[in-house]
Curated annotation (Swiss-Prot):
Highest taxon of source: Bacteria
Ranges of residues in domain SAM-dependent MTase C5-type: 3-248
UniProt protein name: Type II methyltransferase M.AquIA
Record keyword DNA repair present: no
Subunit structure: Heterodimer of an alpha and a beta subunit.
Gene: aquIMA
Species of the source: Picosynechococcus sp. (strain ATCC 27264 / PCC 7002 / PR-6)
Domain notes: Corresponds to the N-terminal half of the enzymatic domain.
UniProt KW keywords: DNA-binding, Methyltransferase, Restriction system, S-adenosyl-L-methionine, Transferase
Stored PROSITE patterns: C5_MTASE_1, SAM_MT_C5
Length: 248
């Protein structure tokens, strides 16, 4: 039986794609950006997309769109906006309204009561204000929840994973916070790739890491491409302007 998930802060659906490959289907997606919502509707035509600010969207509305009741959904996933914790930004953390959106994610988790949840964010979240943000999130996520005469509690753990360690040609570290109410201990995956000097070594379990993939490994077989318009030549400055407008 296909497992169902609720997707929060869905963006263009990248995180959903990963979970679809793992056998899940998205029962409902919640996203504020209109362009991202159009992309979600194009790529997931059978999935309800709720377009709007999550702070004004009740969990009941989300559950109704997903056609489930509390306790019936398998998974809640999401990557709340990370600018307030990013090492590239001003790092206002929980003092920034965007930083507080991690609590909106947990609000939906606590009211929808999925079997499990996965939240992704930038590595900077761990160290913000000497770990106070992470401590607050872990504490909130671990609080007992009473529903229909019963009490539920999530076992929560976190770990920093680097995309390069799993065959992606990019060094991209992210913290993953995982919780489940099934009484199970979650095991984070072990790296499959590493630096060339480590890739030649065999660990204690007889496992040999593959060498990191490079951009050349990923795209060298693609045919040469020419930008279809002058727009590509202006992207760099456009990105700089967008970064400036987002508080960096």
């Amino acid at each position: 039986m296909e497992k169902k998930l609720i997707s929060l802060f869905s963006g263009a659906g990248g995180m959903d794609i990963g979970f679809h490959a793992a056998g899940f289907s998205t029962a409902v997606a919640v996203e504020q950006d209109p362009s991202c919502c159009n992309t979600l509707r194009l790529n997931m035509p059978d999935t309800p997309v709720i377009e709007g600010d999550i702070t004004s969207i009740t969990t009941q509305v989300i559950l109704e769109a997903a056609k489930v009741n509390p306790l019936e959904i398998d998974l809640v996933i999401g990557g709340p906006p990370c600018q307030s914790f990013s090492l590239a930004g001003k790092r206002m953390g929980m003092d920034d309204p965007r930083g507080m959106l991690v609590l909106e994610f947990l609000r939906v988790v606590r009211e929808a009561l999925p079997k499990c949840f996965v939240m992704e964010n930038v590595k900077g979240m761990i160290n913000w204000s000497k770990g106070k943000a992470l401590e607050a999130i872990m504490t909130e996520a671990s609080q007992p929840i009473k529903y229909a005469g019963k009490e539920y509690k999530y076992a929560v753990s976190y770990h920093v994973l680097n995309a390069a360690d799993f065959g992606v040609p990019q060094f991209r570290e992210r913290v993953f916070i995982v919780g489940n109410r099934l009484g199970k201990t979650f095991q984070f995956p072990e790296p499959t790739h590493g630096p060339s000097n480590q890739a030649r070594q065999i660990d204690l379990f007889g496992k040999q890491l593959k060498p990191y993939k490079t951009v050349q490994d990923a795209i060298s077989t693609l045919p040469p491409a020419t930008p279809p318009s002058a727009m590509a030549l202006r992207v760099s400055q456009t990105i700089k302007d967008r970064i400036k407008n987002h508080g960096y």
